[in-house]
Amino acid sequence: MKTGIIQQSLSGFYDVIADEKIYRTRARGNFRQRKIKPVVGDHVEFSAENQQEGYLLKILPRRNQLVRPPVANVDMAVVVTSAKEPAFSANLLDRQLIALEAQDVTPLIYFSKTDLLTDDEYQQLLPTIEGYRKIGYQVYAAREPFDSDQLANLMEGLKGNIVTMMGQTGAGKSTLLNHLAPQLKLATGEISQALQRGRHTTRKVSLLDVNGALIADTPGFSSYETFDMTVNDLPQLFPEMAKISADCKFRGCLHIKEPQCAVKEAVNNGIIMKSRYNDYLQFHELIANQKPNYKK
């Protein structure tokens, strides 16, 4: 019996990294019976007499699991955020950030397509960039999106971690990976003018060994509707709100209608970004109104 990490999932086969080799495996039937689905990033026990015919025996406990993209035991996520074509969406960025906060994954925000902005448009984006930095997020937003110093700094921070690339379809995840590791030659697709959505250029989930980091290149998406947290958990997923919520008059303050709320005061004083607070209110309403998801 061996232990390893699932490096790729494709059509019922799972490629496992172990002993600096890759073993192709299948899941035993009892996984299906117990409705357990192995995902990329899983630490597994498996048997294999050769590198082509192995079987997964056990999935070891997961530290976390992202639903979209489906990756387990993630340390960091590079949220590739388009500045233009498709247009920047703070709401989509915040949806992704709270999903990562809920799973205890460290987000890194990477603005792509900044070179498509006019100088005026770039200047207008800078306060937003600085706003996310002020919260504590690491933000990469050079005027040239693939600036060599910026890429080197990003790569240095990713080494030794399981990393997922996530972001809106067409945001440039594959393009960024191609700049980090040109030898990969990943497929990239031009934006569909009709839908303003990218053609999905990625059809499988893989962990790519890029200069010492295991990076998932995964299908893009056009929206992000996964809200697995409660309304009471939500304020803690906005770090800038969690930081000052102790100053609210009422414990468990949801920062909506409560009097003497430190968070609302911080929004009014420009300490907390208005766009973030508006997204918080929208997410709160969505979570409060969504139907319970009973897992079988």
Curated annotation (Swiss-Prot):
Its cofactor is Zn(2+). GO terms for molecular function: GTP binding; GTPase activity; metal ion binding; rRNA binding. Keywords: Cytoplasm, GTP-binding, Hydrolase, Metal-binding, Nucleotide-binding, Ribosome biogenesis, RNA-binding, rRNA-binding, Zinc. It comes from the Bacteria. GO terms for biological process: ribosomal small subunit biogenesis. Zn(2+) binds at C248, C253, H255, C261. SUPFAM superfamilies: Nucleic acid-binding proteins (SSF50249), P-loop containing nucleoside triphosphate hydrolases (SSF52540). Residues 63-224 form the CP-type G domain. One of several proteins that assist in the late maturation steps of the functional core of the 30S ribosomal subunit. Helps release RbfA from mature subunits. May play a role in the assembly of ribosomal proteins into the subunit. Circularly permuted GTPase that catalyzes slow GTP hydrolysis, GTPase activity is stimulated by the 30S ribosomal subunit. Belongs to the TRAFAC class YlqF/YawG GTPase family. RsgA subfamily. This is Small ribosomal subunit biogenesis GTPase RsgA. It comes from Limosilactobacillus reuteri (strain DSM 20016). The gene is rsgA.
